[in-house]
């Protein structure tokens, strides 16, 4: 386990004395902690201090001086433009400050939210040398018109789960030649109370899926990433399967009949029925063993399986498992055919069916 980034250090640049001197002293104390942790990179976010003075040259001078102190300690300084910064709220201004500071230990930290929430064209990142980008943080968010700080602190989500053009952001980043860490910075009220393992797996999935999308436009991206099939088109729902036992089976049969469904068949050797209304298929599974039996024991009458018609069942499962889904199999009975499947959310199963 490695601490790759120490954050945040707030309200550093643009302060008049004696606050300026105190800011440098604070930085030295943070450097002490970083050296104990074995961390060599600190994130300095653009100042929100009411006493901070504007000016690119003033900020660049502060960072040039800090770069000297950091270099003496074997530390690098990454400057990030907060979307709500007092004077600097745009990565283009942050880059100009870093450029004018002209110090090898001073670089840029890019956060997709801070750029995209202000609707800044991510292609402007392409003009930044990749070796001056020290760290990249990713977050998506739903398109909500609200205060930037509140939006950031409560509504961020995983890349690909919101409305921000995170793929375009990463395409621009990778076009610079950046080869450093890619991290997630997600502030979200639901995540704070969620399962850390589940959230971590979802985060890993989101990064792999995002970088796979980026790789198709930037072929040199991510040599260590798994080779994924392209996303497969879902044509429609093949079936919905319910696990039920005892009187609940009869109740479901009555309900389906009332809704206009008709029993279209029974399994030759299992307590399984197929009900149809046009192209809509519902399966009633009253088996006491296998997945349906386990689902009923855990939750009672429930949807235990969903079948989807897709362009390629094999490609769908291959992509899903590469993104962290767990493949599903169970023993086959006489005359039964294997159908590609994965475990879904909440203990359910998803089967994938194609023309093959």
Give each language-model segment a name:
Residues 38, 90-110, 114-228:
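Histidine-acidic metal/acid-base catalytic patches
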Residues 217-248, 303-306, 356:
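N-terminal beta-strand motif that seeds the catalytic metal site of vicinal oxygen chelate
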Residues 235, 241-281, 322, 330-334, ...:
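Core segments of cupin and vicinal oxygen chelate
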Residues 5-107, 117, 198, 210-214, ...:
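Active-site acidic/histidine proton-transfer and metal-coordination neighborhood
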Residues 19-33, 118-127, 166-169, 248, ...:
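Short, acidic/polar
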Residues 2-7, 40-43, 74-78, 105-109, ...:
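Structural preference for beta-strand elements that scaffold enzyme active sites
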């Amino acid at each position: 386990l490695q601490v790759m980034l120490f954050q945040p250090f707030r309200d550093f640049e643009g302060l008049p004395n004696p606050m300026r001197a105190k800011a440098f002293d604070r930085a030295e104390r943070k450097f002490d902690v970083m050296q104990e942790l074995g961390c060599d990179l600190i994130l300095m976010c653009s100042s929100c201090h009411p006493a901070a003075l504007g000016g690119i040259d003033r900020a660049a001078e502060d960072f040039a001086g800090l770069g000297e102190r950091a270099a003496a300690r074997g530390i690098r300084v990454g400057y990030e433009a907060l979307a709500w910064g007092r004077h600097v709220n745009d990565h283009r201004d942050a880059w100009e400050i870093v450029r004018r500071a002209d110090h090898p230990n001073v670089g840029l930290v890019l956060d997709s939210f801070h750029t995209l929430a202000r609707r800044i064209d991510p292609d402007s990142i392409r003009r930044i040398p990749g070796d001056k980008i020290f760290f990249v943080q990713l977050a998506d968010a739903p398109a909500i018109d609200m205060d930037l700080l509140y939006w950031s602190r409560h509504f961020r989500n995983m890349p690909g789960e919101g409305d921000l053009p995170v793929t375009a952001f990463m395409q621009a980043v990778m076009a610079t030649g950046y080869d450093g860490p890619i991290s997630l910075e997600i502030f979200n009220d639901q995540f704070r109370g969620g399962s850390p393992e589940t959230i971590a797996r979802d985060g890993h999935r989101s990064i792999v899926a995002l970088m796979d999308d980026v790789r198709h436009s930037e072929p040199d991206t991510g040599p260590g990433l798994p080779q994924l099939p392209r996303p497969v088109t879902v044509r429609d729902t093949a079936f919905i399967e319910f696990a039920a036992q005892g009187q609940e089976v009869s109740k479901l049969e009555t309900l389906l009949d009332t809704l206009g469904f008709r029993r279209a068949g029974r399994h030759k050797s299992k307590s399984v029925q197929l009900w149809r209304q046009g192209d809509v298929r519902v399966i009633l599974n009253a088996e006491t063993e296998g997945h349906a039996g386990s689902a009923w024991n855990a939750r009672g009458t429930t949807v235990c399986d969903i079948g989807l018609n897709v362009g390629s069942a094999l490609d769908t499962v291959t992509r899903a498992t590469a993104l962290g889904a767990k493949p599903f199999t169970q023993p086959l009975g006489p005359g039964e055919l294997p159908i590609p499947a994965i475990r879904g959310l909440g203990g359910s199963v998803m089967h994938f069916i194609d023309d093959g």
